[in-house]
Amino acid sequence: MVDLVHTKREEILRLARRHGVTGVRVFGSMARGDAGPQSDVDLLIEVGAEPSAWFPGGLVAELEELLGRRVQVVTERGLDDLLRDRVLAEAIPL
């Protein structure tokens, strides 16, 4: 996992919990270790029974501010069928 996500792990998880997220996994270039300076951060999330009123927009905005990069979040249910197996195989729990 790229240092950016690793060093900010606790803050990412804190923000996620505040928005009702119960699990966070990193996938894509950050998980593979081939992220470049312009790479975004792809997060596979599990949402609890009571997400915040500002979910998911508030979570994404706060994570982008924290990480200084574009952030995309998706749930397993929201994964495209063509990408599902690859994403699940490379996803690394935070």
Where are these regions (language model features)?
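Conserved histidines in hydrophobic membrane contexts and catalytic metal-binding motifs
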Residues: V26
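A short, structured beta-strand/loop element
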Residues: P37-Q38, L43
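Catalytic core of pol beta-like nucleotidyltransferases
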Residues: M1-G23, A31-P37, G48-L94
